[in-house]
Amino acid sequence: FRLDEEFQGPIASQVRRQFLFRPRN
């Protein structure tokens, strides 16, 4: 799951935080 490389920007930080805060059940 390498989205940071393609999403290098201010949104990447928010997206990464949401993914980390969102439990993938």
UniProtKB/Swiss-Prot annotation:
Domain of life of the native organism: Eukaryota
Subcellular location: Secreted
Asparagine amide sites (modified residues): 25
Listed PROSITE patterns: NMU
Pfam (any one): NMU
GO MF annotation: an example: hormone activity
Biological process, per Gene Ontology: regulation of smooth muscle contraction
Chain positions with Pyrrolidone carboxylic acid modification: 18
GO cellular component, one term: extracellular region
Keywords in alphabetical order: Amidation, Cleavage on pair of basic residues, Hormone, Pyrrolidone carboxylic acid, Secreted
Task of the protein: Stimulates uterine smooth muscle contraction and causes selective vasoconstriction.
Family statement: Belongs to the NmU family.
Name of the protein in its database record: Neuromedin-U-25
Species lineage: Eukaryota, Metazoa, Chordata, Craniata, Vertebrata
Gene (name only): NMU
